[in-house]
Structures are given as C-alpha cells and as structure tokens.
Amino acid sequence: MMEMRNVKGTKDYLPEEQVLRNKIKRACEDTFERYGCKPLETPTLNMYELMSYKYGGGDEILKEIYTLQDQGKRELALRYDLTIPFAKVVAMNPNLRLPFKRYEIGKVFRDGPIKQGRFREFIQCDVDIVGVESVMAEAELMAMAFELFRTLNLEITIQYNNRKLLNGILESINIPTELTSDVILSLDKIEKIGIDGVRKDVLERGISEEMADTICNTVLSCLKLTIADFKEAFNNPLVADGVNELQQLQQYLIALGINENTIFNPFLARGLTMYTGTVYEIFLKDRSITSSIGSGGRYDNIIGAFRGDNMNYPTVGISFGLDVIYTALSQKETISSTADVFIIPLGTELQCLQIAQQLRSTTSLKVELELAGRKLKRALNYANKENIPYVLIIGEDELSTNTVVLRNMKEGSEVKVPISSLSRYL
C-alpha cells in the first residue's frame, strides 16, 4: 500500500484551519479594494527564462526555483513570487491606463528552508502600483498595511530604508561595484547575526580583511546617525538622493499618523537585486514570530527591461505572507464556525430542507442542515464541536404550531419562536 504523505514543505488545511485563512484573504481583498486596487490573476507556470531574469530575484533566488520541462522540451518554472509575473503583464499590455494599481492573491513556490510560518508552497497577497514616481505611493502602501493588520487585530511595526542611500554609502567607501550585491546581502542580515557575523559573512564572500574592517566601522558610525546626518557624513549624490526621498517619505508618514510605528533602518536592504529606492519590512510588535510578515519596495527598472526599451517605469509594491499571518493569528484566535445556524429535523426532513433554503435566500445567514440522520444528542454534540452558535430543533409538534426550538449553544438556553419571525432572533 502506498504511504500517504505530503511533499516536504507543503500542507493540507482542514476546514477549521481554512476558515481562518479565508478570513485573512477576505480582509486583504477588502482592504486592497478600499485603496482603489484592481484584481489580477497570473499563471502559476511560467517560462524559466522569465523567472530567472537578471532584474528579478538575483542569484540567491535561482537556487530555490522549482523547474520542469513540458512535452515540447521547453524549460518552465513555478513562480517564486507575484512581482515578476505582474511586471510581465504590464510589459505585455502597453495600453494599460497608468497609474495602474493591482492586487493578486495566489500560490508561489520556493525550494528554500522551512521554519515557523514558512513553507515551500505558500500564498502571497500583493499590491503593486506602476506609474507613480512620488514616494506618496510608498506611504499609501504602508498606511494600507497598518489598516489591514488593524482589521486582523495584529499590531505591527514597519522598518524602512532606501537602496540609493545604501548603495551610495558603499560607493563612498570604495566598495567595488561587482562586490556591492554581496556586501548588501551580508548587511541585510545584521539584525540576525550582529556586526561580528557581518564581518565573518563578508570575509566568506571573498572580501578582503581591510575592506571588511572598513564596512564594519562604517556600520557602527551610521547607527548613530539620523536621516539628515547622512548627507554630511557621505558626500555622495546617491546618498543625497536617498536622503531626500527618505525625508519626503517621513513627512507623508507623519501626515498619515503612522510615523511613530515605523523605524528607519539604514542597513535594511531586501536582498533582491531589483530594488531601486524605498524598501520596507513588516514585523509583529510582540515578535511572537521573529521573521517579517510582509515586505516590499520600489523597483523602477524591471518593466523597461522586459519591454526592451530600458526606460524607467516607476513601480512600487508590497507583499504579505498569508501563511505567516495565519500562524500568528492561530496562536491568538479561536477558530470560528463556517455556519451561523444548524437545523436538526426530528422526522421533519422535507420541511427543514425548505426552511433552510428560505433562510439562505432571505437572510445573510450561513445555514447548515443535519443530513446524516443523527439522533438529537449526537447532532447537538456535532454543532457544539463545530462552534455553531445557534441550533434550530424542528419536530412534528413545532410544525403543528408553526414554531421552532431555538437553542443558544453558548448559553445552553432554549426558546420557542415563530417560524415567520425567526430571522429576528438570529
């Protein structure tokens, strides 16, 4: 007999789990649409050439791409994010009206390490805006993140930076261009591995000891600086551009009333090579999950590269991990039922079928009907285990008086109510 098991890094979600996951998805959709975003769906299966493009995830992500061949021997890949497919859609549809704000919620795949809230098949919830140069777009996406997590009763902080600032700092201390990406990947891990860990990491990447010392000394001096201080500390045009954008973003965050819940982090990099400006990561305030639960940033070069005109198409996005949000919520929240009311017929199946259908047609109630013919005690036990708040018990006596027995499962109380006014009691 075949051994039944899931592929490592994948998971089945049973109904009591999926109820909460659907709640998160609906909260995302509702919030995204409140900000004027339009829905989009892209294929899970893509050409490998697209997913491995140099302006995409960079060398690190190439190791995690799931690849396959079709019967025509074409090299294909499962998408590892929703950003590159979105950029492809914009590049293929030059008549899209800009600015274009889209959201997509879908499965992505990465053959990477597995940890709490992180799987190899997972769902991302993305919003991207193309056609806006102003960092007002970043501010709006950050405000949207706070609204989404407020809806889900989760408190967050957002760390942010600007890649122009970071690239300018490295340029000003004479880090060679070909080593910049390696240094950025090391600096991006500073909160996890500390300054000594950064030194060790850059040395392992082939950086000289002298250069490693320069990097570490620069990091230590930068940690004491405010955003405005960087202009004086580093006489570099990229640093100046980064500071200007960061100061403008900060003004918008103050105007939106969210600045106090954000943190400027000069070494936040979002390792991916595609980012050109603002970058940010979202964390739970209580750190019940230590990894980020959302992230994003500005990437102005990808669409132009795909279209072959190498023009800038100003684009900024944000992405939330549904699975890691689910992990956070499942630690705090009692799983709610899929039904509001459960109807138990006692020899009155036909009439109960009609009553259930009438309630579904005339109210917004979610109604489940006892179909298995269980005795009253077993049916009530089922409703209790499923956290269904109300039960209707309908026998011949009730039908003869046009009433039903309404049982409040939380309180354990019962009352007879007229069928005609049933919806008022639920």
Swiss-Prot record:
InterPro entries per record: aa-tRNA-synth_II, aa-tRNA-synth_II/BPL/LPL, Anticodon-bd, Anticodon-bd_dom_sf, His-tRNA-ligase, HisRS-like_core, HisRS/HisZ, HisRS_anticodon
Main location: cytoplasm
Entry-linked CDD domains: HisRS-like_core, HisRS_anticodon
Protein name: Histidine--tRNA ligase 1
Keyword terms of this UniProt record: Aminoacyl-tRNA synthetase, ATP-binding, Cytoplasm, Ligase, Nucleotide-binding, Protein biosynthesis
Catalysed reaction equations from the record: tRNA(His) + L-histidine + ATP = L-histidyl-tRNA(His) + AMP + diphosphate + H(+)
Matches recorded under PROSITE patterns: AA_TRNA_LIGASE_II
Gene: hisS-1
